[in-house]
Amino acid sequence: QKKDKKDR
């Protein structure tokens, strides 16, 4: 699963 930059 890739984490989006919005997951910050």
From Swiss-Prot:
One CC-aspect GO term: extracellular region
Record carries keyword Glycoprotein: no
TM annotation in the entry: none
Tissue: Expressed by the venom gland.
Subcellular location: Secreted
Key words of the record: Pyrrolidone carboxylic acid, Secreted
Residues modified as Pyrrolidone carboxylic acid: 1
Family named by the database record: Belongs to the tachykinin family.
Protein name in the entry: Tachykinin-like peptide-III
Origin species: Phoneutria nigriventer (Brazilian armed spider)
